[in-house]
A protein has these predicted regions:
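Anionic ligand-binding catalytic core segments
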Residues: 1-101
Length: 101
């Protein structure tokens, strides 16, 4: 198993919602397949396999909308707070294209 992490909360260990994820401006494929044969970066594919992760399509759609909104509203500010120059932010912008559509 790769790219998994856990968070200890008051009621025990929980799967981290995100771990070892790095934006890649020119990326169009994941390191690992999402299903048995597709490594495409695709929201539709993620929603398609949600039931296999015991997440309803309705809940997965709501989660995706929440993540996209959070990224859209915060990535530039957080990048600046971390010291990324304006030109570096522009270089990285394509990595966030799904959230910016």
């Amino acid at each position: 198993m790769r790219n998994h992490g856990f968070i200890l909360k008051g009621d025990g260990w929980h799967l981290s919602p995100l771990y070892d994820v790095n934006p890649v401006p020119e990326g169009d494929e994941l390191s690992l397949c999402v299903n048995e044969d597709d490594a495409t970066i695709s929201l539709d594919l993620a929603l398609e396999i949600a039931p296999y992760c015991e997440i309803s399509t309705k809940d997965a759609t709501a989660m995706a909308a929440d993540v996209l909104k959070t990224v859209r509203e915060n990535w530039n500010r957080l990048a600046a707070e971390c010291g990324l120059s304006r030109s570096a932010q522009e270089y990285m912008r394509p990595a966030f294209s799904l959230a910016l559509e």
